[in-house]
Amino acid sequence: MALPERFRPAVSPLSDPGQVLVGPTWRITILTERLLRLEWSDDGQFEDRATQVVWNRDFPPVPFELTRDGDGLHLTTRGLQLAWDGRRFSPGGLQVRQPGVRDWRSVWHFGDAETVQEREPGWHVGNLGGTARTLDEAEGAVPVEKGLLSAFGYATLDDAASLALDEDGWPTPRVGDVDLYLFVHGHDAPAALRDFHALTGPAPLLPRWALGNWWSRYHAYSADEYLALMDRFEHEGLPFSVAVLDMDWHWVDIDPRHGSGWTGYSWNTTLVPDPEALLADLHGRGLKVSLNLHPADGVRSFEDAYAALAERLGLDPADGDPIPFDVADPAFMEAYFDEVLHPLEEQGLDFWWVDWQQGGSSSIPGLDPLWLLNHLHFLDSGRDGRRPITFSRYAGPGSHRYPVGFSGDTVTTWSSLHFQPWFTATAANIGYGWWSHDIGGHMFGERDDEMVARWFQLGTWSPINRLHSTSSPFQGKEPWNFGGPAASVMADALRLRHRLIPWLYTMNERAHRLSEPIARPVHHLDPRPETLLSGSGAFLFGTGLLVAPLTTPAERRTRRASVTTWLPEGTWHDWYSGLRYTGGRFVTLRRPLETYPVLARSGTIVPLVDGDDLSVANPEALLVRVFAGADGEFVLYEDDDAAQPASCTTRFAWHQDEGVFTIAPVVGDASAIPARRRYRVSVTGLAPSDTTSAEGTTSYDPATGTVTVDLGEVAASEGASFGFAPAPTASDQRIDERIFAIVHDLQVGYIDKHQLCAFLESTPSTLARIAGLESLPIAQDIKDVVLEVLLAGAE
């Protein structure tokens, strides 16, 4: 049957004939200088349709040289050299080399095993990993699938098991025996991702509201209880943009003759007497709403939509027979969306949480139901001019087209927290950029306020920040349920996440346009053994930021947790304290509970919401953070959040030598942003300056070395600029003051404190302090926390 247009993705699967070499049973397509398609078909049939993974093979022509050698050939582009003996593909007969690379391991042979490296650094390195379907019930590390990068510079994407998409966009059996895409990008991760997204489709532009804080909990909320919770969040000044209702929104305690209550499509009107009123109230608070779906048990006679669905499918509703859930039947799926899901959306639902946990088999051989559910839900959600979104588990390469990812129900332990940053960043190696995790852990484990606070801090600096937990009354993630400083740390993490939305939304647009996932392994910027082998979990976050998550408890005496990571070349500023670090080395970062290791490279510019605005709208006021020491620019992207957005950009630029900051006039359709906007600009890493060419007020924070200029209101169409006179110099690191604060905080004997301070006071030279510290008769962890600051001061 013909599917509605909304279920037919735009594809362009035919390659330029001039880029295709073909024989009776083989075909080689030069897609880019570093991407080849290699096919073998015993019956001479080759797949020209789009597949579940690959949607586009229509690449611009690239130059190549071809030399025939009997039945074989030699093919050369600027990025690779292929040699083939003309026989059935084999390890000895088909090889690809990387020009200029001498390591024998960099030569790809057909059939080479591409094992994923071990989780921790080790002598064996292969493929650098991609991601996994789920973290359900995981406590710590899980195996991940292959990605597009390896230590040896090549990786393959095997598309032979993919189903083809017919003219209606429906999955169908394919032809051909071997269908392999060979990525030969060396360690150029950005180029590999650009080619991959050109081949499979770009990452979509997420709605702006998806980048705020999500509230979710497996709990049988009544409407009154849920709204009271939202009232409490507002009273506490805790901003949320998404409200997720887990499965208790529908009837779960059903007549046993119908089976399990796991699947449901009808509101539990005992808990929610007026669903439309609840949804309208949540919308009035600026929240988007998602409902949980476990669709595997089909639609049964007690459901509100049963009669309409039965009649649509030609069944007699009076029979009362369950209607099986058949994801492989296009007639059923079209009716399912139209008769079951759309009426709920018309009540005010914004998007679905597709919680499929019933395996990978269907009535179409080779079809994983999860993939088709993700595919159809995402496409359906974009109808009527809406920006599409779904929320589900990963279903293999190409799943980046269906954000947001749901990683599943993890165990609440430090080992789970330790694995998540690495897992999130490594997913970028397969172009998958929008994982959301159960921040704080989902189930089991044990209560540890420090651990949950650190998880919240990680959530701030994650692609998606979604709080979630099981139904246990002891595992809710409301910050006020946690004791001591943890509660305020958690609240501050949520507030900072919300303030980052303008910057995050620009990163969202970059991910869509430039194939640059927001969270990426450090080797994407600085590929070297120290980063390719790194097991620290540190990752790049957007443009110019590096996050080094704290995933182990604090040391008792120092009250600080620590992490060691490679820091790429350049000068890096601590986001919270302003302390500067010199890169090109390993650094160990130690932080008390109140702060987190987030470093900004000199020249980085980050715009944030200024003030206490809890909405996700394009803000009336911005605080623009600038990290001095190098020139930098940032182009802020804003739009109206439509599927075909009216968008505009505002360019911020910092000129280090001149000490000038510029806000350029807006470019594009500015109808979605304020005509006038209040600006404050904070430049970190500068000595105080008494003079500025800006109109407005200037203040200085000596603790962080930050000059803040309040520009007042600036017309978007005009922009503004200011400069410092004389030209700015770097701020004093205030090393002694920082060390005194650390020593004051140490949980050790006072004699040790005095001894340490006396040594520092009598030794003014930084190098002498570093050398002499080791000889002091105090514990090593105390020396280490002081050494971090001394090394930073030795720049």
Regions found by a protein language model. Name each.
Residues 6-7, 31-70:
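A low-complexity, Ser/Thr/Gly/Pro-enriched, surface-exposed linker/loop concept
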Residues 97, 104, 239-490, 523-527, ...:
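Aromatic- and carboxylate-enriched substrate-binding clefts and catalytic-loop regions
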Residues 378, 397-405, 419-423, 427-437, ...:
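Catalytic core of carbohydrate-active enzymes
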Residues 49-63, 574-593, 689-712:
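Solvent-exposed beta-strand/loop surfaces of large extracellular or lumenal domains
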Residues 602-697, 711-716, 721-795:
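Accessory, solvent-exposed terminal regions and/or long lumenal/extracellular loops of proteins
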Residues 72-74, 80-81, 700-721:
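A surface-exposed beta-strand-loop module
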Residues 66-208, 217-218, 223-224, 230-235, ...:
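Catalytic and substrate-binding clefts that recognize carbohydrates or anionic sugar/phosphate headgroups
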Residues 28, 36-38, 75-82, 546-549, ...:
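Short, well-ordered beta-strand segments enriched in hydrophobic/aromatic residues
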